[in-house]
Amino acid sequence: MLELKNVSKQYGTKQALKDVSLTLPRGEIVGLFGENGAGKTTLMKCILGLTSCRGTITLDGEPIFRKNITRLSFGTSEHSFFPGLNAKDHRIFYEDHFPSFSEKRFQVLMDFFALPEGRRIGSFSTGQKNQFEVVLALSQGADYILLDEPFAGNDVFNREDFYKVLLGILEPSETVLLSTHLIEEVSDFISRAVLLHQGQIAGDHDVQELEESGRSLMDVIRQTYQYRSDRVLQALENLSDVDGPF
């Protein structure tokens, strides 16, 4: 179990995270939602030890250090691969450094995304780079897979097909923490939704329980973030007042 207790992070005068407590058991697909700047990426980086923070983060009761960090993997739109290497070079590197690396899963995902194995990753398109990030994160053999906006630069058809493949290849013991703005697309396959607002947990919902109560995840998110459906009309009216009729 991955557990966070009272995790806080501050950048200068900006409070990026404030007293975040969260438990992630094995075998869940958890959606992490929030506005831009809500703290989603910072939270993942704190879990992985990529940035310092206050509070405690443990994996099965133990702090996350070198001996258990390989149980976590990370796919990020900021990219963590070696741009000068090709896919084959990455496969060899991961086989040498991650004992649980799955060559079969790596190859299945490479074929699924139709990624060229001999080309330098730095020459890939943005969408291909993000796809390769996902390939590495899912092939590492980690128990906890953290994906931060993994679908940027990918069209809706690629995304929909990938969701199906993801559900098909995950083992029951693997946990995915997925940060995305594509709420409606992922609401059908995530089991839980964690909502961040201004660096704090604003909601933690079982998706099935929401559906049974007659509410959708989108309804809850709109309510949590006080979405104003009239703001588009108001903006157009304000423009019309300033500039005259279009």
Predicted feature descriptions by range:
Residues 76-132:
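ABC-family P-loop ATPase nucleotide-binding domains
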Residues 156-158:
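Helix N-cap at the start of a conserved alpha-helix in ABC-type nucleotide-binding domains
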